[in-house]
From Swiss-Prot:
This is Large ribosomal subunit protein bL34. PANTHER family: LARGE RIBOSOMAL SUBUNIT PROTEIN BL34M, MITOCHONDRIAL RIBOSOMAL PROTEIN 34 FAMILY MEMBER. Signal peptide: none annotated. GO terms for biological process: translation. PROSITE patterns: RIBOSOMAL_L34. It comes from Kocuria rhizophila (strain ATCC 9341 / DSM 348 / NBRC 103217 / DC2201).
């Protein structure tokens, strides 16, 4: 049987999906903006 694909790791999570990672690209900034306008409690990982 294959191993589980999700191996939680907080550093990897933040580096890939965190706020600063989002702000690095134009598309990421668009995501943050969309989540802000929607009124999300949490903007990113």
């Amino acid at each position: 049987m294959p191993k589980r694909t999700f191996q939680p790791n907080n550093r990897r999570r933040a580096r890939k999906h965190g706020f600063r990672a989002r702000m690095r690209t134009r598309a990421g900034r668009a995501i943050i903006g969309a989540r802000r306008s929607k009124g999300r409690a949490s903007l990113s990982a």
